[in-house]
Design a protein with these regions (language model features):
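N-terminal core-binding DNA-recognition domain of tyrosine recombinases/integrases
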Residues: 30-44, 54-127
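A generic short-segment signal for beta-strand/edge and adjacent turn/coil regions
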Residues: 17, 44-46
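N-terminal DNA-binding module of tyrosine recombinases/phage integrases
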Residues: 2-39
């Protein structure tokens, strides 16, 4: 399971990154968060995006999906998992209750979409 990790830099400032279930740095996410730091993401934005992307990365790990091979239905499954919890439960409610507020789900999706926009632009500039 990926997690957002607070990091204290040499100059004493605090920032956030994402580590995977093997405690390794998630390089594509770190590149995006570093870009955010360079364009002056506020510290709370960096933290919120790191937490959101850690949830996304955990979802990808559980589903065995590579971050650069996602399909549209993967985003739908992620949104559903955020709203209603685990999808693999043998017990299904007829009317599941949301586990996160709409604004939190929207924040998570905003972070994920921003991450993919960054990746698309970054790849364009390299090619």
């Amino acid at each position: 399971m990926a997690t957002a990790q607070r990091v204290t830099l040499n100059d004493g400032t605090t920032t956030w990154t994402v580590i995977d279930r093997s405690f390794g740095l998630v390089e594509p996410v770190e590149a995006y968060l570093e870009y955010g730091r360079q364009i002056d993401f506020r510290p709370n934005t960096t933290r919120a995006y790191a937490q959101s992307l850690a949830q996304w990365w955990s979802f990808l790990e559980v589903t065995g999906t590579s971050w650069d091979a996602v399909k549209l239905h993967d985003f739908g499954d992620f949104i559903s998992a955020l709203r209603y919890g685990e999808q693999d439960s043998p017990i299904r409610e007829l009317r599941p209750r949301p586990t996160l507020s709409d604004s939190t789900v929207n924040l998570r999706m905003r972070a994920v979409m921003s991450f993919y926009r960054y990746q698309a632009e970054d790849r364009k500039s390299v090619v």
